[in-house]
Amino acid sequence: MNRVYLDHNATAPLRAEARDAMVAAMDVVGNPSSVHGEGRAAKALVERARAQVARAFGADGADIVFVSGATEAAALACAGRGLVGADIEHDAVAAWIDPVLPVDAAGQVGVADPAGSVLQAANSETGVVQQLPQGLAVVDATQAFGKLPVAFNWMGCEMALVSAHKLGGPKGVGALVIRQGTELAAQIRGGGQEMGRRSGTENVIGIAGFGAAADAAVRDLADGVWAPVEEFRNILEKAIEAAAKETIFVGKSGVRLPNTACFAVPGWKGETQVMQMDLAGFAISAGSACSSGKVRASRVLRAMGYDDTVASSAIRVSLGPSTTQDQVMRFAEAWEKTYRRFRARAA
């Protein structure tokens, strides 16, 4: 069976540029904190990647603090600050905020006090792109970076979260981007690495891959690689709607990530669809979240006003630059077959 990967919002395939950079970094033996030649060589790789990420993210002049991923970046940026946000934020951010900000039916968040608020640039589940006000305390750019022309310096925020593996870099590395002059106490203390914000020997191999992936992702964005992806996403949604008229498409009326389709057939459990499509050779995600073996209705969709029947029935199909129209149509055909079986059983 030739499997088709349609879960790019969960993680993107490793880019060749990132792999090459990581393989080359494996031969650099030094610790970046060491002053000898080997240490300086490792330090040079880290600083090169720091410059690559800063350039790709439009963050010239900002501090790029390398961490283990966007989850750690969220904790470092948000913990203990009394920040507010909305109930559509990723779990890694939601753990540190008071989810009091209103969300409308289109998934847009109302922000009264940007300086005390956290807001995502784009939602990983629905693809909805936020209208970011200036002066936010923290922007979660994890899903937007590499798919949209986001830039730290025009977002006007204090800090932003980014992750390597969402744009074709390795898993286990990300960055907290901090406006210069911002005070931020370290959570992990020790050797004072990463400008004193995050101690511990840097993941040189992963960081090298991150820098290369960021470079490649922004180059591809400028070359228009996401335009056909958006076209294929729209073709998919038309095929799904033709097969099942009752399908609800989440966020479709507004601006979305070009690769993301989130839709629900009320009453047809999202996790059931994920398993059925997996058996058919397609990797997708449920709109509902799994935690400790328990499945609950998507709080993102509930925050947008959908009831539990819809919120527990949603699935997410997220494409990538390598996705073909043939793969999209094969998925639509396989989904329609499983949908017809669902309707036959429900009759």
Set out the residue ranges of the language-model regions.
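Pyridoxal 5′-phosphate
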Residues: 1-347
